[in-house]
Structure formats: structure tokens, C-alpha cells
Amino acid sequence: MSYSSDGAAIQNHSFAYARSPDQDASSPPHHPVVVVGAGPVGLSLAIDLAQRGQRVLLLDNDHRLSSGSRAICFAKRTLEIWDRLGVGDAMCAKGVEWNLGKVFFGDDLLYPFNLLPETGHQRPAFINLQQYYAEAYLALRAAELPLIETRWKNSVVSLQQDEPGAEGKVRLEIDTPEGPYPITASHVAACDGSRSPLRAMLGQESTGRVFRDRFLIADVRMQVELPTERWFWFDPPFHRNQSVLLHRQPDNVWRIDFQLGWDADPEEEKKPERIQPRVDAMMQQALGHAVPFELEWASVYTFACQRMQSFKHGRVCFAGDSAHGVSPFGARGANSGVQDAENLAWKLDLVLRGAAPLALLETYASEREFAADENILNSTRATDFITPKSEISRLFRDATLDLARNHPFARRLVNSGRLSVPTTLHGSSLNTADRDTFQGQMVPGSPVADGPVEVDGQPCWLLRQLPANGFSALIFDGPQTPALLAMIEIAAEGLVPLKPLVLSASGVAAERFDALPGTLYLLRPDQHVCARWRQASVVDVGAALRRALAVAA
């Protein structure tokens, strides 16, 4: 398998099981970090930790990547994270970029939309890319990093923890084709999916709301001349009283989601003879005629919006679908999981280095639980709008859609899936509250907006200039710059490395940060703002750094 492999080769690729020296050890070998699950979240976390210098053991109970397209819609923030992990270019080169979409009601186009209406961003709002490609590029990147050891066909079958404390360990028993063996770990990341065995081993569960509806996913390969846009239909003439979603993927594959209703038979609806007339009717509506197609993959699913009460239990942190689940409307599942991984990686790295206390890992749970609640709220609202549960709800929904034909205010009420955006971590204990007045979106807790900048006389992108492994300070150039550079070095002494980056106090970046000469922004390793000042002192920056590290003052 290589970066140039096609979809069939990737899906047919098997990773070889290999016996580990741990299986012959006289006592359980110890690992600083064990990541369980080699999906997009587990692979992203393992790569991030390894790039920070941490040795990672990655376990997966299978020996293949995902089959079928599954998650396909990867958001701008996920692409920016993957840029830092060394796979963003491969993802974007293969993926289908899109920013535009259309919403239909019955026979009519209600309105188009643009998810990236402003210029000055390196990455698009979204790419569509089959999950098996994303996993393949991440697996290839992981194989390039000597600090990652991946063990395929290694299943965690039991987990026990010592009592809480600085020297605590997690004890794991791993089953393989050659029998079980034990290991210990300082920290475990459970990225083992929605049916998480590790969650069950700890006696935990996800709670929330299960939706009584069924949807058919059909991936069809066909040659059609349609724009690269997200098309969503409410009550289309070819599928009355239901909804339909159409997306382009690479390799002339199209993702089509058909709402079926709760009474649909999942096994019957997956049959090609049931799918054929549905796709033919859709193409008749879109093109005026049916087209030949090949059914590549089909699945019928129900879904839930739910999460664990806490994402951290002792020395085990849960990330991705093991911690939270949402409906597919809005592409919030895999995207939020990759953001989980980024949030956890820098904190775990600093804890392992002794640069931050264990308390920093508690903020992984609190911040990502906050993000999960936001995603669940948006996903639930979208699902309620798309699948009204009563006649009154349907009447309200349809009246809103009617208004949206001609009235822009009503379009804000139409919800075909509020698409994934990164969470601004309002209220995080790692944020330093503003003392000065600022405008715009770059508040403490927000992810940094990319933009064109000039560094050392060369044009470049802001996010590409931020350090891969540490904190950074954005200084907007002015007479104070030399003093600020000296002050930053003093403030960070004895804490963590802090990289200064001097930017022009005019231009796109300065506008987005509402910057004046001398404005300073303190950024976390995951590229979130944690503090900002019009005039910063060494005491300000030192205190904000300690706060962002969860170090007691």
C-alpha cells in the first residue's frame, strides 16, 4: 500500500500480524502511552504524540482499514490538524474540495450557500474523501515514525487500574492469534469506536437520545456532469415525504443518503434491486434521465446523539466515537474526534515530560465534553428538523421551508445539518480572561484563523508558521516589539518553550485578530488562543502560561 494506491487496493490491503517481544517477556512490559484503535482518531493521536517525541504503542483488533466510505466529509480545521501531522497535502490532493451547496424543497431550489465566503484561507471549507483513504494516509504516516509501534490483530480483553496517584499504572491483557499477553501503561487512550470494549470494561456507558428513523447510505460509481456541491432535498418528488442528500467523492463515486422511515426493513433496503430505482428516480430529477451506475457499498443505519458522562477515568481517556456520538447531519463525528486527539496529544505530552501536572489531563475531559455537548446540540436540532416527529413539527418545518424560498431571514431557520466548525472553548479553565477590549472572533478559547502573512519577507500561511510542538506568541509589530521579544523569553523561563512570531500590524491577519501595534496573542500547542493583550507584561504572560498548563500559581 502506498500514497498512490487506489481505493480497491487500500480496502483489500491486510496488515500482517507480527509476534512482539512483549509476548515472551517474563513480566508485563511497560509502555508510557497505549492508544487502542487505529481509526482516524487513534492514528491522528499516535502521530501527534510521536511527533512530539513520545513513544506510542498503537493496538488494533483488526488487520484491515475500514470498508466502504463511512465518514467522508472532513472539515477545514481537521485538514489544518492533518497539515501539522504531515498528511494534509495527501488528503487534499485526493479529496474533492467543496465550499458550495444547495437546499431544495419539493421541485424547487430554495437557496444556494457558501461555507467559505471570505478569501485568505489555505484550505477549503471541506473535502470529501472516503474514510479508507484517510486511514490509509494516516497509517502510512504512522509507519514513517519510529516512535510508533503498531500491532495489528491485538485486542484488549481486560483493563485494570491502580488507585489514583502519580505512580499509577493501567494493566492490560492483550489477545492475539497466538494467545494472550499482559502489558502495563502510564496512560491509555481509548479510540476504539462507538461500541468501545474499553468503555464496557470500565463499567461506563454513553447516554443520550436514540432517533427512531432509518437511513440508507449508497455509494454509487457513475459518470455524471453535476457540480461539486452538497445537495440536500426536503420532500423531493422522487422520494416523497423523506429527505435525500447527494455528495461527490473521489473516483467518480457519489454518496447518496435516503431517509427511509422507522418501519423500513434494513436488509431489504440494502439490496441492489431496491437501490436501483431510487437512484434512477433521483438522476431523472437532477439530469432529466437515468444513468448507468455501479453500487460500491450500501448500509442502513439508525443513529443516536449521546456521550459518556466523563471522557476521563483514572489514566484512561476516551476520544472520538468511544466518547461521543452524533447523527451524520453536519459531519461532526470524525471531525470532532480528530479535534479530541489534538487536544489530548499536547496535554499528555507535557504531563509525560513533567512540564505539567496530571491536572492538565482533567481539562481534556472538560474541554472536549463541552465540545461534544455543542456538537450534540447542533446534531439533535438538525435531526429534529430533517425528521419531524409530529404533524405539528412537520407543518412548522414545511412553513419554514416555504418562507425560505423568498425570505433570507427564514433560511437561517432551515437546518439540513449545521456543518462542522471547531468549538470555541468558552469558559475553559486554561483561558485567561480579557482585560482589554477586542472585536472579532479570536477570543480566548477560539481556534486560530489561518490567513496570509509575511515572515522574513516571504509570503506564507499563518498556521504553517506556528510551532508543531509548543506554545507560541503572536506579536503584531510596533515600537514595542524588541521589548516584547525579551519579555517573552523571561516569562517562559522554567515553564515551556515559547516561540515568538512577529507579524505585520496591518493586513488580513491583523484584521482577523483585531490587532494594533504591540498586540500580543498567546497560543496553545493546539493552535487555540489562551490569552491576549493590547499591552502585555512579563507577569501577564507568565501567569497566562501557568494557567494554560494547569500549574498552580
What are these model-predicted stretches?
Residues 2-36, 51-52, 105-108, 136, ...:
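Helical substrate-recognition/capping region of FAD-dependent monooxygenase/halogenase enzymes
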Residues 42-43:
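N-terminal Rossmann-fold NAD(P) dinucleotide-binding loop
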Residues 70-141:
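Active-site-adjacent segment of FAD-dependent monooxygenases/related oxidoreductases
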Residues 29-31, 178-187:
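Core beta-strand elements of the Rossmann-like FAD/NAD(P) dinucleotide-binding domain
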Residues 152-170:
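A conserved short coil-to-beta-strand element within the FAD-binding core of flavoproteins
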Residues 109, 139-140, 187-303:
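Conserved FAD-binding catalytic core of PHBH/FMO-like flavoproteins
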Residues 10-12, 270-336, 356, 378, ...:
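FAD/FMN-dependent oxidoreductases across multiple families
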